[in-house]
Amino acid sequence: MTWSRFHNSSEPMHCAVAEREGKLLGMVHYIQHRSCWTTVDYIYLQDLFVEPQVRGSGLGRALIEHVYESAAKSGASRVWWLTHESNTDAMLLYDRIAEKSGFLQYRKLI
């Protein structure tokens, strides 16, 4: 994993953190990108992490809502993300704040 792109102002990558008393409790990073389907950008929420001891406190929702606000300010028309089908705890949150797209992901590592 590399964090160098977050420090490069020409990269459309962003990160937000939540902390209390200097301790990191959660983070989200997201990427603004173009799409062939629209003339405005999309935001891909690439990673969301919340420390286990504060899960269920609303912190994950707050981090996602930060991404929504950032997307709106940038003129993006959509925020989207992926999750593993076994991540049922997170999906309880996602089902309340977004809609399932119905798409399945296929990939081949190169």
Segments and roles (model prediction):
Residues H33, E51, H84:
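Residue-level recognition of the GNAT/N-acetyltransferase active site
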Residues S35-L45, R55, G102:
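A conserved beta-turn-beta hairpin within the catalytic core of GNAT-like acetyltransferases
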Residues I64, A71-T83:
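Conserved GNAT acetyl-CoA-binding A-motif
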Residues V17, K23-Q32, F49:
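Conserved beta-strand in the GNAT
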Residues V54, G58-H66:
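Conserved acetyl-CoA pyrophosphate-binding loop and the N-cap/start of the following alpha-helix
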Residues R61, K73, E85-L104, K108:
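Conserved active-site alpha-helix within GNAT-family acetyltransferase domains
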Residues M1-C15:
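Active-site rim helix/loop that mediates acceptor-substrate recognition in acyltransferases
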